[in-house]
Amino acid sequence: MTKILCGSIAAIALLASSAAFAQVKMKADITGAQEVPPTTTQGKGSADVSFDPATKKLSWTINYSGLSGPATAAHFHGPAEAGKNAGVAVPIPNQASSPVKGEATLNDNQAADLQAGRYYINIHTAANPGGEIRGQVTK
């Protein structure tokens, strides 16, 4: 009986620890209306984001269309709640054409801010150098 109980406890602990470090799936709907201040644009996009708490690896696939011109830059910004601006936290390279895929390793503070919903994706153009479309990253 003791062996069965110990084995059951070990299995539960293993499942609990693997669940605690499972990939966290997030998303962002990216529009001009979310820019601060809002922009008038036909541009829109979406992002599928995943985060591995064990390795702190952030991965993304971003799709966008309808911008006023080519994307000149893209970043994860934070920490900031929706409706607030913040500096660049993670650059998004190769943003010139959609889809954009990439990954980065975050530090502890960045990981905490991301998981708390305090990161947003911003895509910039020449006509809107402060950002043409933006979307808060949420679970």
Regions found by a protein language model. Give the residues of each.
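Metal-centered catalytic cores of metalloenzymes
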Residues: 2-8, 12, 17-74, 78-139
